[in-house]
């Protein structure tokens, strides 16, 4: 074969290759090699073609021959690395890419292939370094900037990843992957509004990308834009009906909307579609919560058992399981799993860092301080400060670490040495241990039968009590009431009571209803068809949270409230309290009992079915009549 003919056949093969006719191109290269078996260009191109045809072992054979004939042929080494990568021979592939780079330091493709392989090997730091070298050669390579962003995201360098995606987008405004990945990084930073914008830009270029609709739905759900989130999940499912994650996301939003039956059906579909045990365990755990809310307790507990079998170490799944177990009174089993909330940062403020002190695990202490960190809502700070009083009684030197607004109130917890809102004031203390307040019952092995009985454990200020006694007077049967929770979660919505339900109490002769409500809900008072006394604009406005509420409660005959901080405050003060509970309450109130292990003076009134506040208040009215007859 003449060199001219070989060149023409090679060019024919290249033209076919570029058009996508890879099999025909391979035939041309093979034809050349029959007559010129040492034609390095034909060997390289045949190896490349075989690689594209998934004939990787043959590709390696021809590319090795090329590199033996031309040891410094950088392109041949690069192609060989690609074929070896496809065969799973990663170390040999990296060595081939390195040889290509050593022979041609400006061969950008070799850097990119090397970096992509490092990403597949989960070595993102080395991948970033390699992408940087590629981009120093070709700074306008938009895909390189995008891939570099993925590597940075893998390293949790999210801001740097976003900057890299921005470079890619500046070079190629319609690069779908850059917009989508940018959205993922923003979502990981909690910047969900910006994430939705990035997902929208990605979908403008590729509207049928199911995963982007899924991630958009997740961010919208975090923003509580629930109807939009549902629409995104449904769009994802229209494109990919087998997408378990979209069914799961849809179920989570429906649960937030208190549409529990629909949520369970979504979780059912998600479980059926997913074969990954850990993920299925997570789905089972959330289905258990939804079943719980429907009162389908045997099914919920069956889901708990299944979850523990298939996902024995998944933080989200085990935390969800713990909430079901706690509600059912299985506290010993639940407490270790409840600790998973810490890894998930449940109720932990943004930017919180654990103290440097050693954690307390239940050991006896001599002169060391034991700092108990309050967590989650105001009611939980109040409730779990009872363990501060309990441990102080056992001889521990207790410091309560709480919200600034609660400091004055919690200073009345008996036996505690200090109440702080900033642990910097303890900087000079060397002998310190610490624990989260809501971890203490688990450390102590607390069960519903062994809750500390040191009630009351809060005290109202005597002067304030006297001032409110004079203001309120002594006439009538005084009932302090609260009705609406301030939060926006599905539980807050279910816990809140329409003010109109208190009409049955207001109709009882001699009863005075006195509002303990602050913030959301007070706007309902003027429209009430019965009298509700208010305590003025300055009520609980200065000097610390609940100081006036506590003093007023000491002058009341009864407090009636849903599950909220008012319920915990009244219980901690030892005041007679009726707590009106939704059909399936938070775990703190347990099931199937009308008393509380936390508060001996508290009675629980439960809905007989979802939304049955009239039934609850009929029973509360009967109890008020009975209570009045005892005191008359």
Where are these regions (language model features)?
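Alpha-helical solenoid repeat scaffolds of the TPR/TPR-like class and their adjacent stem/linker regions
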Residues: 1-632
């Amino acid at each position: 074969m003449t060199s001219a003919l070989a060149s023409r056949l090679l060019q024919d093969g290249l033209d076919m290759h570029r058009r996508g006719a890879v099999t025909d191109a391979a035939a041309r290269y093979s034809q050349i090699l029959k007559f010129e078996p040492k034609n390095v260009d034909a060997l390289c191109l045949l190896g490349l073609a075989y690689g594209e045809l998934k004939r990787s072992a043959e590709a390696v054979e021809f590319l090795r021959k090329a590199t033996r004939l031309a040891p410094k042929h950088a392109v041949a080494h690069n192609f060989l690395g690609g074929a070896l990568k496809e065969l799973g021979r990663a170390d040999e592939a990296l060595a081939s890419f390195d040889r290509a780079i050593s022979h041609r330091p400006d061969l950008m493709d070799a850097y990119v292939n090397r970096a992509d392989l490092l990403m597949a090997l989960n070595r993102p730091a080395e991948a970033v370094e390699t992408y940087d070298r590629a981009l120093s050669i070709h700074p306008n390579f938009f895909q390189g900037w995008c891939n570099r962003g993925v590597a940075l995201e893998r390293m949790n360098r999210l801001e740097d990843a976003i900057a890299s995606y921005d470079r890619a987008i500046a070079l190629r405004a319609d690069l779908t992957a850059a917009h989508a990945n940018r959205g993922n990084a923003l979502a990981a930073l909690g910047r969900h509004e910006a994430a939705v914008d990035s997902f929208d830009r990605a979908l403008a270029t590729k509207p049928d990308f199911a995963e982007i609709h899924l991630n958009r739905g997740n961010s919208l759900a975090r923003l509580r834009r629930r109807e939009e989130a549902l629409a995104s999940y449904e769009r994802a499912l229209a494109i990919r009906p087998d997408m378990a994650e979209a069914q799961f996301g849809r179920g989570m939003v429906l649960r937030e909307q208190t549409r529990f039956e629909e949520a369970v059906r979504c979780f059912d579909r998600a479980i059926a579609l997913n074969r990954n045990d850990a993920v299925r365990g997570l789905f089972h755990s959330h289905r258990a919560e939804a079943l719980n809310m429907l009162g389908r307790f045997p099914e919920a507990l069956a889901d708990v058992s299944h979850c523990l079998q298939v996902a024995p170490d998944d933080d989200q799944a085990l935390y969800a399981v713990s909430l079901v177990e706690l509600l059912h009174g299985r506290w010993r089993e639940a407490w270790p799993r409840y600790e998973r909330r810490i890894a998930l940062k449940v109720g932990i403020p943004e930017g919180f860092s654990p103290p440097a002190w050693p954690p307390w695990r239940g050991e006896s202490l001599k002169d060391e301080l034991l700092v108990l960190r309050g967590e989650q809502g105001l009611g939980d700070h109040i409730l779990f400060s009872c363990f501060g009083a309990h441990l102080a009684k056992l001889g521990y030197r207790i410091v309560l670490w709480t919200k600034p607004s609660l400091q004055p109130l919690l200073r009345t917890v008996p036996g505690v040495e200090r109440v702080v809102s900033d642990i910097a004031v303890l900087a000079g203390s060397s002998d310190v241990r610490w624990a989260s307040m809501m971890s203490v019952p688990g450390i102590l092995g607390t069960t519903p039968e062994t809750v500390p009985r040191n009630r009351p454990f809060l005290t109202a200020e005597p002067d304030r009590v006297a001032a409110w006694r004079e203001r309120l007077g002594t006439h009538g049967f005084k009932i302090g009431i609260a009705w609406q929770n301030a939060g926006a979660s599905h539980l807050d919505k279910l816990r809140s009571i329409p003010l109109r339900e208190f009409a049955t109490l207001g109709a009882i002769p001699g009863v005075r209803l006195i509002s303990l409500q602050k913030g959301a809900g007070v706007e309902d008072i003027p429209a009430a068809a019965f009298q509700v006394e208010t305590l003025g604009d300055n009520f609980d406005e200065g000097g610390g949270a609940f100081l006036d509420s506590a003093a007023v409660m000491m002058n009341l005959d009864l407090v009636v409230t849903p599950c909220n901080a008012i319920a915990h405050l009244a219980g901690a003060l030892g005041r007679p309290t009726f707590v009106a509970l939704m059909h399936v309450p938070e775990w703190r109130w347990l099931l199937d009992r009308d008393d509380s292990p936390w508060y001996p003076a508290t009675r629980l009134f439960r809905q007989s079915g979802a939304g049955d506040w009239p039934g609850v208040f009929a029973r509360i009215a009967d109890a008020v009549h009975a209570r009045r007859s005892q005191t008359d």
